[in-house]
């Protein structure tokens, strides 16, 4: 049997000399006082970030800025992410447990994205369902700017509106039948959902990421409680990633393959809530 071993040939990750020097200097300071737990932890995080940045550069060299797989395949993506990881989005494995729900976007008339970041989902929704109306929100002005830029780069800025803060009353006004609401706001989902009048959002569907916060703990129970009266609720757990499906990752070692698809998540599931009234 002929063997092609070229796909396993190791390619050096792009090296960032200046950043490598910074990491080395920091590590040197830490080793002089290894009893400092905070310093040791900071050094470990810096090392992980440094290696992840190298993997991001490798992924850019392989694929440029085009999303390779998933429901948003073909999307022109920016060269950095806001509040999330870069490489998983380019590879198309980002939050892949949501893909079955995102592939149903053409069935909706409106997509509301609360906590849109740089616009991966807001812009992706317009590409996956060209006729859909998209309303995005983010309290970070830099994220809103990146979202506008990403929409323009993909030619979908005409059907996408971007706002700053989404209050319960704002969301109720948008929650018409045929609307999918996606919420990822780092724990503030409890306040937003808790302020809704259930009858005014009973005709739309929800995708909500839960979070572990120092004040509330895991918000899963609160999210389910807020939606279960009017919606059929499904807890969407994280799924393992399969790097073997991406030939370009084969030359990398296990750690780098892992980092290419690593999203930096804790045990924080999503919740999908399907309108009971619309289903009936």
Predicted feature locations:
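Short, hinge-like loop/turn segments at secondary-structure boundaries
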Residues: 130, 152-155, 178-181, 199, ...
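Conserved Class I S-adenosyl-L-methionine
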Residues: 224-236
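S-adenosyl-L-methionine
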Residues: 2-135, 137-188, ...
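A short alpha/beta connector and helix-capping loop motif
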Residues: 179-180, 191-224
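Residue-level marker for buried hydrophobic side chains located in beta-strands
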Residues: 110, 135, 181-183, 206
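A short acidic, amphipathic alpha-helical/loop segment
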Residues: 101, 124, 128, 170-174, ...
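Generic detector of well-ordered alpha-helical packing
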Residues: 96, 114, 139, 185-187, ...
């Amino acid at each position: 049997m002929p063997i092609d071993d070229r796909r396993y040939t190791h390619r050096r990750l792009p090296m960032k000399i200046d950043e490598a020097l910074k990491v080395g200097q920091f590590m040197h300071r830490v080793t002089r006082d290894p009893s400092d737990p905070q310093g040791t932890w900071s050094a470990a995080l810096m090392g992980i970030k440094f290696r992840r940045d190298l993997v991001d550069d490798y992924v850019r060299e392989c694929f440029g800025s085009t999303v390779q797989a998933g429901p948003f395949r073909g999307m022109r993506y920016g060269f950095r992410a806001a509040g999330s990881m870069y490489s998983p989005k380019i590879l198309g494995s980002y939050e892949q447990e949501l893909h079955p729900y995102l592939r149903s976007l053409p069935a909706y008339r409106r997509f509301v994205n609360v906590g849109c970041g740089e616009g991966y989902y807001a812009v992706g929704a317009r590409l996956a369902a060209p006729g859909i109306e998209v309303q995005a929100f983010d309290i970070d002005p830099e994220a809103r700017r990146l979202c506008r830029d990403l929409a323009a780069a993909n030619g979908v800025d005409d059907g996408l509106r971007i706002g700053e803060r989404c209050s319960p009353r704002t969301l109720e006004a948008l929650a018409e039948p045929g609307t999918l609401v996606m919420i990822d706001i780092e724990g503030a989902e409890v306040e937003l959902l808790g302020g809704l009048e259930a009858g005014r959002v009973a005709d739309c569907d929800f995708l909500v990421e839960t979070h572990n916060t120092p004040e509330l703990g895991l918000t899963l129970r609160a999210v389910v409680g807020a939606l279960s009266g009017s919606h059929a609720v499904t807890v969407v757990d994280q799924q393992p990633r399969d790097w073997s499906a991406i030939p370009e990752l084969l030359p990398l070692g296990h750690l780098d393959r892992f980092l290419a698809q690593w999203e930096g998540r804790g045990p924080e599931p999503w919740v999908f809530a399907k309108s009971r009234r619309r289903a009936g």
